[in-house]
Amino acid sequence: MEATPSLACANKCVFCWRHHKNPVGREWRWKTDDPTFIVDEGVKTHIQMIKETKGIPGVRMDRWEEAHTVKHCALSLVGEPIMYPRINEFLDELHKRHISTFLVTNGQHPDAIATLRPITQLYVSVDAPTPESLEAIDRPLFRDAWDRLRRSLRSLKDKGQRTVARLTVVKGWNSDEVEGYANLIALGHCSLVEMKGVTFCGKSDASNLNMSNTPWHHEVIDLA
């Protein structure tokens, strides 16, 4: 299941496939739904989506039935999940149902990362190797965005759990400065580094990216 407890984010990344339809903010200022309600509705909606695939040619019924039981939850659908004020209760609710948790954060809320309870896998997005490129790519609302990212990465080494530095490669924007990436990743002693090429999702008034910014697979491998 892919879900999020927060639609809001403190960045306006040039590669955001949501085309910036979600709200932005540096702190939470919206209605706070109950964690159990969010999980209940998320699971219910997930099951409804699975049911709608029953008549598709090639669907195996054993796999279809298995998919009704949520075993894993990726908190990366939209927005910044760690902004949700009751994030730890939300994660506890998933764990009580024996659902593993994979949370992706943009690294702009280091204090929330420090107080986050153990989860299955914690990702921090490392979108740029320098302060200047971070400002250009993430277009953060926080003026101290670079410092926040570095603090977030430093806190990973104290988490005592599996952690990941996630890089989204945008050709011509952040596809060089390998040493800068290496220095950032080293701050967190990350268990893993996940690297992916940006996917061009069509023209948007909020960004001037085009297909030329999508790297070839071999270019991503070379950077890795």
Predicted regions and their residues:
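Canonical Radical SAM [4Fe-4S] cluster-binding loop centered on the CxxxCxxC motif
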Residues: 1-37, 41-44
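Hydrophobic, Leu/Ile/Phe/Ala-enriched alpha-helical segments that form helix-helix packing faces
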Residues: 42, 46, 50, 153-156, ...
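Short Fe-S-cluster ligation motifs
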Residues: 37-65
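Conserved AdoMet/S-adenosylmethionine-binding subsite of the radical SAM
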Residues: 55-218
